[in-house]
Amino acid sequence: MEPIFIIGIILGLVILLFLSGSAAKPLKWIGITAVKFVAGALLLVCVNMFGGSLGIHVPINLVTTAISGILGIPGIAALVVIKQFII
């Protein structure tokens, strides 16, 4: 098969996906996840700022941000408990 023919088929399928609206669903999911991760990071910053006087410090990295973003307040509480008693 000619490369032009293959590129044309792929381009046609991409245009069909955009016209049908199904390409927006994964982008929406990625956006929601990104907002949750940012909110989790901000919550961890607040915990580190206000918990600093109590000796509470949770490192901010991808794993802790994901846990606090997805689980919310219970996730942050779990991270603090793990940090204080296990590590």
Curated annotation (Swiss-Prot):
Keywords: Membrane, Metal-binding, Sporulation, Transmembrane, Transmembrane helix, Zinc. It is a multi-pass membrane protein. Signal peptide: none annotated. It is found in: Forespore outer membrane. Zn(2+) binds at H57. GO terms for biological process: sporulation resulting in formation of a cellular spore. The chain crosses the membrane at residues 3-23, 37-57. It holds the Pfam family BofA. Residues 24-36 are cytoplasmic. Residues 1-2, 58-87 are forespore intermembrane space. Involved in the mediation of the intercompartmental coupling of pro-sigma K processing to events in the forespore. Inhibits SpoIVFB-processing activity until a signal has been received from the forespore. Could inhibit SpoIVFB metalloprotease activity by coordinating a zinc in the SpoIVFB active site, preventing access of a water molecule and the sequence of pro-sigma K, which are necessary for peptide bond hydrolysis to produce sigma-K. This is Sigma-K factor-processing regulatory protein BofA. It comes from Bacillus subtilis (strain 168).
